[in-house]
């Protein structure tokens, strides 16, 4: 009897309940002894102050789950004794959990409920539910009173801590706290956390602490609403719209949530594929970093060619990858391929190469395929899927290969995998009764035979077994996702699947008009699952509200409804859309594709790669976006060819009297865009049926050359006009025409000059037209050997024309200063050049960067000064050509 009583009292007594626990340290009332719980669940006396600090630190950052000495297996639950409130204890067999906040051990509540017991939030013990107080929270009045006093003390301590905090820290914490109720992407974690807080215990730590440990501090900034507006989150939006998000399992690995952070930094150098010339690898620099995306810039070229990619993109590689894999790297503008060296270039630029560890595509497992370089296949143009042409595999990297259209330039090549729906085995078109576009210039067009073509080209067809069938994408209409805005790639918007086909989806931006919808491949890296922006720290553009659709944005200043003044139709990040003409969302730009001169056409550096005849096929950025355009040109080809022959006869007759009577400008009879299509928009049928029509087309272009708007000038000889307007490839075929000076102005007769004197009012109108033409790109292709917009910019500096660089190199510092002051808008900058003792020779060696950064001159005047230097050099070159 005595033994049973003693055992019962020993079982009822819990040493943890008689101690005061705080930060993992237990204090025994009435003594100075301090205890801690070791890794085996046993109590240990703390003898050193440093040991106590380490215990507190470990408790603040760790969630302990260790068994105690009382957690021995005992009798079944039905035979377990129920203790009175004064002797509440831990149920046997239940593991102990130590709170991060208090360090007090407690047991899991779920298991106790299954046993019919109640948990006391103060002493962290269990007992009969019939004897509990305050709705089952406390076992006695003492515990309830003690818990109330503790809460009041915590509130006072919290207020004092907030007052002592750094104001900067407090400002940072306010938006973070406001996001806890809004970021419902982590709803399950938040529900668990709130439930644990109600129980007086924090099992996983606060959400902010977890994010800080993961390094996702940018996630806390995402989704902050503008002033006066409500916050936006996916969970409430899906509930309001009664919509369903696209399941994450439908996205490919490169579209779904990344495993690592984006480690790229602004200024890092790397190698990558040019998206407009996918057969070409270029030197790139990280211009911007936003979430898991990076904006890449072509070294030496305008920022209008910058483009966005994900940090795990397959088309970017570390420095030295091309040399290692045997690929040709195109150096920056102004560098020769044989002289370019990465080490010296990085040293010159004082830049850092992106670490190899940042490139996810370096660890790809290569799966063997049946494709080999040189094999033939039938491939569709991605911009016009109905056009299927003869193609060749020209390169292979990992699990992808490069498709090149035979006898077409490389600007239409693209990378794909073996399961791409755009490629087919040899004979697929014949089997499915589809039209196969043969290579331009191929002799046997009417009776094309694959067997004969393979024999002539000494090549093999890609085996049919190498082509894999792509499974259905699974996307359904009205599902929600996040998608990149192709008209303004800086933004990722809330989107809906508006329509689907076999391998594509139609993306609709919520709140916007359906005129902005566009088709995109289901495996495109520009679409992501719901919550991708929040997880990666990328800003997500919420749907437009009805108020934003009724009134223009007050902050952006753009008249287009919904536009906030960010972005530009011509990709210029630094020009605000203050007018509808520049807004990418305005009605006048909806039907336009972003038409830029080819990045390589204005390259003045020595050619490092063969120039490709871009006139053999239409520009995909202009008119190849729809199959109807190509079919229309193909149907009307015969009629156009006959007209060209007639124009050729007329042109030869008019060329004889070109000095006597100028012909009217083509702008009166044909718009510039139509001229561009005549020159570039030849479908494959055109190129293959009438190779002789190119000469007639060149003659027609010579007749239809647009004239300068300021003064009527006599028409030049056809040879000179062809040399000025023909593409670079056509100039190579006509060396006699290419030898003509391209910058020399036409010689006017004195009588014509007198007749061309405009009035003062006309002069003002012409000056405005010149300024507009210098700012906005024309449809006329630029002269290949001169920089972009050269003709437009040179019109703004008439006083510079005709001065060769050899004369400028002999100028003194005073003469350079006087010249700078003579330029419009540069009157105050002449003194700066004089103070820096810059003579003519040093002036010619200056770059635009030197003028802006070293001389501290604003961009506008710097452009005029730098353009004058270019004009001096061009005049010197023209003088040598004339000799």
From Swiss-Prot:
The protein's organism comes out as: Mus musculus (Mouse)
Region annotated Interaction with RBPJ. Required for transcription repressor activity on Notch target genes sits at: 1-64
Known SMART domains for this protein? MBT, SAM
User: Which residue intervals define the domain SAM in the entry?
Assistant: 811-875
Compositional bias annotation for Acidic residues: 157-166, 185-194
Q: Where in the cell is it found?
A: Nucleus
GO cellular component terms listed in the entry, alphabetical order: nucleolus; nucleoplasm; nucleus
GO MF terms here are: chromatin binding; identical protein binding; methylation-dependent protein binding; zinc ion binding
- Protein name as catalogued: Lethal(3)malignant brain tumor-like protein 3
Which top-level group of life is the source organism from?
A: Eukaryota
Question: Which stretches are annotated as coiled coil?
Answer: none
Using the UniProt entry, state the residues involved in the cross-link Glycyl lysine isopeptide (Lys-Gly) (interchain with G-Cter in SUMO2), renumbered to this chain: 638
Could you tell me which InterPro entries the record lists for this protein?
Mbt, PcG_chromatin_remod_factors, SAM, SAM/pointed_sf, Znf_C2H2C
The record's annotation in SUPFAM superfamilies points to: SAM/Pointed domain, Tudor/PWWP/MBT
* Entry comment describing in which tissues the protein is expressed: Detected in hematopoietic progenitor cells in fetal liver. Detected in adult bone marrow, heart, brain, spleen, lung, liver, kidney and testis.
Disrupted gene: phenotype observed: Death at a late embryonic stage due defective erythropoiesis, defects in the maturation of other types of myeloid lineage cells and anemia.
Please indicate if the UniProt record lists Nucleotide-binding as a keyword. Answer: no
